[in-house]
Amino acid sequence: MRSGVIAQKLGMTRVFNDGGEHVPVTVLKLDGCQVVAHRTKERNGYTALQLGIGRAKVKNVSKAERGRFAIAEVEPKLKLAEFRVEESDLLPVGAEITADHFVVGQFVDVTGTSIGKGFAGPMKRWNFGGLRATHGVSLSHRSHGSTGGRQDPGKTFKNKKMAGHMGAERVTTLNLKVVQLDIERGLILVEGAVPGVAGGWIQVRDAIKRALPKDAPQPGKYRLANSAAPQPAEADAASDTGAQA
C-alpha cells in the first residue's frame, strides 16, 4: 500500500476533454509535502509515514516540535498527517512528494472536513418532508414530528435523526478520477467535488476499491531535499537508487 499525500484545496474549475465536453474538476495543490518521520513496528507497533505540508512560523511551533523538524531537516509544517504503508513503501525522511505520485486516469479517495452549516433543522439536515402546510398545523411546518413510541419503549432512541449541528465532519469521497497533473506547479485536478472549504487541507490516497494502475510509481514519486529534479520510482527504473524503502 502506497502513501497518500496532503494537499490544499484551491477551488473548482472546469477543463475540456478530447470530445469537447467540459468536466468539472477540483484543483488540489501540493505545497512542499515532505516526509517528516517514520513509524515502525519495532518502535510504534505499526508502519506509517508522517507527512507535513505548508510553512509554519517558527514562533508558533513548540520547542518539542521544532526538535522533531530539526531531526528530519525540514522546515516547520502547518499540517501533519500519518499514512499507513507497507514497510517496502517507506520513503526517505525529508523527501518531497510530487504531483506525479499519481497518474492521469487513476481513481483516488479524498478525505477532508465538510463545510460547517451551524445548527440546522431536520428538513435541511436529514431531508425530512416536514408537516402539512395547512389543516391543523400551526407554527410547526418544518418540525420533525414524533420522536418515539408510547409507554413502550418510553424513550427516544440514540441516533434518532433530529435537528442539530450540521457539517464540520470528517468526510471521505471515494473514486474520484485524476483528470490532469501539473508537475511544475504541484497541481492535481480531480473530477467532481471534494469535501471542505477552499484553502482547507485534504488527504488524497489511492482508491481502496479500485485497482492501482500498472504505471503508478512504486513506492512513489518524490524529489530529495537538495535535488531540483524528481527522483524516479522503482517502477520507472529498477536500477535507480532514488526511490528506496
Curated annotation (Swiss-Prot):
Start-end of Low complexity biased regions? 225-245
Domain of life assignment: Bacteria
Q: Where is this region: Disordered?
A: 214-245
Query: What PROSITE patterns does UniProt report for this protein, alphabetically?
Result: RIBOSOMAL_L3
UniProt xrefs under InterPro entries: Ribosomal_uL3 (IPR000597), Ribosomal_uL3_bac/org-type (IPR019927), Ribosomal_uL3_CS (IPR019926), Transl_B-barrel_sf (IPR009000)
Keyword terms: Methylation, Ribonucleoprotein, Ribosomal protein, RNA-binding, rRNA-binding
Q: How does it get modified after it is made?
A: Methylated by PrmB.
Q: What GO molecular-function term can you cite, just one?
A: structural constituent of ribosome
A GO cellular component annotation here is: cytosolic large ribosomal subunit
Entry's Pfam families? Ribosomal_L3 (PF00297)
Family, as annotated: Belongs to the universal ribosomal protein uL3 family.
* Stated role: One of the primary rRNA binding proteins, it binds directly near the 3'-end of the 23S rRNA, where it nucleates assembly of the 50S subunit.
Q: How does it assemble?
A: Part of the 50S ribosomal subunit. Forms a cluster with proteins L14 and L19.
Protein name, please? Answer: Large ribosomal subunit protein uL3
**What is the source species?**
Methylocella silvestris (strain DSM 15510 / CIP 108128 / LMG 27833 / NCIMB 13906 / BL2)
Organism taxonomic ancestry? Bacteria, Pseudomonadati, Pseudomonadota, Alphaproteobacteria, Hyphomicrobiales
**Gene for this protein?**
rplC
